[in-house]
Amino acid sequence: MNWLTPELIEILVAVLKAIVILLAVVVCGALLSFVERRLLGWWQDRYGPNRVGPFGMFQIAADMIKMFFKEDWTPPFADRFIFVLAPMIAFAAMLMAFAIIPITPTWGVADLNIGILFFFAMAGLSVYAVLFAGWSSNNKFALLGSLRASAQTISYEVFLALALMGVVAQVGSFNMRDIVDYQAQNLWFIIPQFFGFCTFFIAGVAVTHRHPFDQPEAEQELADGYHIEYAGMKWGMFFVGEYVGIVTISALLVTLFFGGWHGPFGLLPQIPFFWFALKTAFFIMIFILLRASIPRPRYDQVMAFSWKFCLPLTLINLLVTGALVLAAAQ
């Protein structure tokens, strides 16, 4: 097998790693539905799903079978091509955003020098999915939900980007591995960039349209918003894409502010995946806890909060960080 050169083997191993990691992220996103319902039931002092399998563990399998056999219906008044394209973009954008996150020193999909910029590009692409879904459905509730979503996402993506500029200024690189290595030799960025972390976390919740920033799909006001005409696997792609977004934002918080795969104080460096998974699971639980504990504000309050609170806080954090970096360089 002379054609099996070392270069080809290296490419095949890299492709296999990418497939395994992305499939694992999709499976985690699907399983989060069950985890969320069990945790919400626990926190709200009720049972939650407990009928299908031991402790309700097969509930997600039952849901997937039900979703698979539902009618894949497209409204006759919809723009069919864009209607079908929207959930694909929503799912693919969040999955591709995870590709730049290093899980361990040797495991990751892509090691890009412009990793953070690639994440911003994928986050911006997800806005098109929501707009396409609302416009192509030819439904007033879907259109209102998509307009809300686009305005909210574009607003909070400004702070999502600005919150990370303090980290980039200190490290001097957009590469995610460089950021993790910097934190291994210095303080985790949760301490010097605490305000940047707070803003990034708030913006991350808003960009994923999670409670309390789930205005685009507010059931009481918009009858599920831009999802209203979707059913079956198309709705399932939106559904899983939202949970993949939670996993992606949680993993980014760990990578950018909590040392990535490193344990606290250099503890047990032999198990990098354990530390990464543990910290990511913690932030996923925080996402779920927000749904269980915080009421949904009005849409105007959400937008006012973004521009009147998040923007000044982010700019002050960026100015102070820039001044300190310049002072240290002189």
Swiss-Prot record:
It catalyses: a quinone + NADH + 5 H(+)(in) = a quinol + NAD(+) + 4 H(+)(out). It is a multi-pass membrane protein. Keywords: Cell inner membrane, Cell membrane, Membrane, NAD, Quinone, Translocase, Transmembrane, Transmembrane helix, Ubiquinone. GO terms for cellular component: plasma membrane. One of its GO terms (molecular function) is quinone binding. It is found in: Cell inner membrane. InterPro entries: NADH_UbQ_OxRdtase_su1/FPO, NADH_UbQ_OxRdtase_su1_CS. GO terms for biological process: aerobic respiration. It holds the Pfam family NADHdh. It comes from the Bacteria. Belongs to the complex I subunit 1 family. This is NADH-quinone oxidoreductase subunit H. It comes from Ectopseudomonas mendocina (strain ymp).
